[in-house]
Amino acid sequence: MIKVEPKYLFLARRRILRRVLLPLFAVLPTVAGLVGCGDQATQEADHYNDLAYYYHYRSLDSTTAYARRALQVARGDDGVIGESLNNLAFVAIMRMDFPRAKQLCDSVNTITDDQIELLVSDILQMRICQRESRNKDFYDSYQQAAQRLRRIDETSLELTPRQQRRMVYARSEYRIVASAYFYYVGLDRQSAQVISGMGEEDLASDTAQLINYWYCYGAGGLLTKGSREEIYQQEFDCLMRAYRLAMESRSTFWIANTLQALSEHLLQRPDGPRLMADNPRDIRLINTDAMPDSLLAGNLAERSLHLFRQFGDIYQKAGSLRTLANCYWQIDD
């Protein structure tokens, strides 16, 4: 066996270190830079998705623009891409382009394994099914969303602050969409039960969902305790809370929605005149055109219709037209 002198052994080791480690050290800054760029791109895309969500009920065009911008800077982050597609699906639903909305939701399921965005996609599918009266498909999406919620709740302590905010939207939207579906198919008890699982304190970080919450209670059918007069007053109070929040947040969609619901409440006889007599301060707040009592409901419906046209929600615009027709019928016009 050949004996190697210690000094030669030291030189050999040094050559190995130079050949192996020095190239590695040269690459590390590049890798760190790529990771940094990836993080920066994700943060930028998250920012655009946050803006897309912010404009959900303010401007559909803005939501579309910011969601597309998020897609452009996503750099292959499947969670970011899934969120962007969900934002675009929301716009498609509002514009009643249900085939496009379903296509976008299906894309989320093939692109990402991000459980939160898959949950949001399931909830959007629930809304599509509700709008298209596809009952079996609704229940399929409803059950799938429930299973995802349970899985996410098992790891809720691991969610980032941004993911926690996203879950405030997902959890509340799940209950709101389900409640609306049960209400329209005549299951009033289930409708009230599913939405009672959350309270306003759960929505403190999401103004849009808090408005939605108060609107659901004010629109009718969920409140059952008390006399007819007491229930109508409670619903009116809920609608006014939603209206004030919508005005403060400049939420075009919710201003229009609350105006339409208030119009329908004021149309009712004898409840409408009683509401006007018992709530003079609130009536002054919504009667911006100083209309006489007999024409106020029609004025609210017209303003609602104008805002829905401006916003671009075809489904709700049809509802405002129906309410306005009832107003004309009421005054024999």
Where on the chain are the PLM-derived regions?
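Bacterial N-terminal signal peptides
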Residues: V20-G33
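A "functional boundary" signal
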Residues: I2, Y8-A12, F25, G36-D333
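N-terminal Sec-pathway targeting helices
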Residues: R14-R19
